Amino acid sequence: MDETLLDDIIRRLLATNNGRTVKQAQITETEIRQLCLASKEVFLSQPNLLELEAPIKICGDVHGQFPDLLRLFEYGGYPPAANYLFLGDYVDRGKQSIETICLLLAYKVKYKFNFFLLRGNHECASINRVYGFYDECKRRYNVRLWKTFTECFNCLPVSALIDDKILCMHGGLSPDIKSLDDIRRIPRPIDVPDQGILCDLLWADPDREIQGWGENDRGVSYTFGADKVAEFLQTHDLDLICRAHQVVEDGYEFFAKRQLVTIFSAPNYCGEFDNAGALMSVDDSLTCSFQILKASEKKGRFGFNNNVPRPGTPPHKGGKGR
């Protein structure tokens, strides 16, 4: 993709933020198609299980909350000042899924070895057809463009390993993973199936109430207990599981004696929750720290601070689309 055009798309997306309101970006359908095509090539040129190195900043669900994505970059540093890994769920729910996904794809194409995107359960046609992205594409462009995004999403990697010690995914563990090679072997492009390793990586949830594997209230995949986290880490010689997929009150929340962390980066999610959002920084020694996007009653006035861990709040249980 032409470097000058790419830089101009990024400039236009960032220019939507004038300090108080965030306007819609003026990007043509042709430009978005080029962006999808270029990013698809980059995704397929890199493994399905990305092998990354610290230092890196990790973000959870963004869900079309474009002003909050810009705030994440304001506090973490705009690329390439910092390396980033996003854990999926870029679209649906929020008002500006198109700006959100376009900026992330543009950064991916421009900084392919410093900026990484994983697939979330909402990067799937059957889900984002229902929860807002399809309607936004149809209203602002056309259904053809939604299909182009779908083809791009089907090529996203599904997991990342940081310095052989921190395993990241959108959802959670799978009872079918015997070796990390099982993740590497998942073919692409691929739609998200109703069961199996790919489904579980995008849909599974930890559950404090159980041991072993349980039924998931979402109607998809499983829940897993702290014992399964400890067992998985020991088997694969890992230190931490890092995932997203659930709203947590403080933006991040530990599980299983700090062997798993949930990160959620959309504060005041959907305007219905009073949750904070978080950004996790992993330094060279693999020490994790958090920057918090505080919850706020007034949209557009979030504060940030470094937060010490507080007692965890129970994960919200919700329907299939959350």
UniProtKB/Swiss-Prot annotation:
Picking any one GO molecular function of the record gives:
metal ion binding
Q: Region Disordered: start and end of each range?
A: 303-322
Q: In which tissues is it expressed?
A: Strongly up-regulated within developing flowers, especially in the tapetum, the developing and mature pollen and in the ovaries.
Keyword Cytoplasm recorded:
yes
- Which residues does the record give as Mn(2+) 1 binding sites? 61, 63, 89
Task: Name its co-factor(s).
Answer: Mn(2+)
Key word Metal-binding present? yes
Which UniProt keyword terms apply here?
Acetylation, Cytoplasm, Hydrolase, Manganese, Metal-binding, Nucleus, Protein phosphatase
Recorded catalytic activity of this chain's protein: O-phospho-L-seryl-[protein] + H2O = L-seryl-[protein] + phosphate; O-phospho-L-threonyl-[protein] + H2O = L-threonyl-[protein] + phosphate
Compartments in which it is found: Nucleus; Cytoplasm
Q: What is its EC number?
A: 3.1.3.16
Classification via InterPro entries: Calcineurin-like_PHP_ApaH (IPR004843), Metallo-depent_PP-like (IPR029052), PP1_catalytic_subunit (IPR050341), Ser/Thr-sp_prot-phosphatase (IPR006186), STPPase_N (IPR031675)
Which domain of life does the protein's organism represent? Eukaryota
The record's free-text note on cofactor binding: Binds 2 manganese ions per subunit.
One GO cellular component term noted in the UniProt record for this chain: cytoplasm
- Locate the residues binding Mn(2+) 2: 89, 121, 170, 245
Q: What does this protein do?
A: Serine/threonine-protein phosphatase that possesses phosphatase activity toward para-nitrophenyl phosphate (pNPP) in vitro.
Q: What is the protein name given in its UniProt record? A: Serine/threonine-protein phosphatase PP1 isozyme 6
- Which organism does this sequence originate in? Arabidopsis thaliana
